[in-house]
């Protein structure tokens, strides 16, 4: 998943059971195509699907950040930290991050906005359609 992240993200070649192929760098597509059994993997796929449904973007970032948080939480559990303490820590971190957003916000130039739109559309549509839609913004 990490390798699909960002404007220089790499495409993935997906092959289903019937040999059909799909090339994509869309995180939710990669995940929803995967066959997984592990409950945590299923939870991450569900999180990605929710992100896609709500924002239509950010699925890979959501999964990469969530997976890293889970990895760190597991290390804390292995060190003897109670899961409830970890959950409280995540809640405090969320509150702190949300309180900082206003101070971190910047005014973007038209060029930066266009670049962000193009990045968001990359790999989701035909390239000509991506260029056309990004100019409409």
Where are these regions (language model features)?
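N-terminal glycine-/lysine-enriched basic segments
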Residues: 1-136
């Amino acid at each position: 998943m990490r390798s699909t992240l960002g404007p220089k993200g790499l495409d993935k070649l997906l092959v289903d059971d019937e040999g059909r192929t799909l090339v994509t760098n869309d995180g939710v597509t990669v995940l929803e195509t995967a066959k997984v059994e592990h409950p945590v993997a299923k939870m991450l796929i569900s999180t990605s699907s929710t992100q896609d449904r709500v924002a239509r973007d950010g699925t890979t970032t959501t999964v990469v950040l969530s997976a890293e948080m889970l990895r760190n939480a597991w290390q804390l559990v292995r060190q003897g930290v109670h899961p409830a303490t970890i959950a409280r820590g995540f809640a405090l971190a969320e509150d702190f991050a949300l309180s900082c957003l206003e101070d971190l916000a910047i005014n973007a130039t038209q060029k930066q906005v266009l670049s962000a739109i193009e990045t968001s559309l990359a790999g989701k549509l035909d390239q000509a359609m991506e260029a056309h839609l990004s100019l409409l913004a």
